Amino acid sequence: MYSDISKIPFDDGHFQAVEWLDDGFISEWRVFVLDGHIIDMQNYAGDIWTLPSKNTIMHMIYDFEHAPGMNVPPAYTLDVGVVPCKLLNTKVIEVHDFYACGTYSLNDHYHYPIMLWEWWNWYRKSIRDT
């Protein structure tokens, strides 16, 4: 698990899971991202009162969207977890294209169709360009 998403190794342009976390997460959250902005964040497992670090999540989003060689979709979800340690620490769990994620009580009904539309346009352009 990484707090710095830019340090995650790549395999043919894809991120790899590279570390097993023995102690598990105190809480797990799905962050809905559109064009680099957090649209919503929902807890999907663990303690709802143990929140991830906003600053860490913002750095994760920036690092992911600026990773060399990545064709980052405009709409995606970033799953993060809070791990137990002296200071609670936010780690990346995984990233999903927006079409391939559970919405886990996404409360922003205005942005939901926009996120699907933006992802679909990005996908169509990606296919044309390959």
Regions found by a protein language model. Name each.
Residues 29, 71-85:
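A short glycine-rich, hydrophobically flanked beta-strand micro-motif that places a catalytic Asp/Glu
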Residues 71, 84-130:
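C-terminal active-site "lid" helix and adjoining low-complexity regulatory extension at the edge
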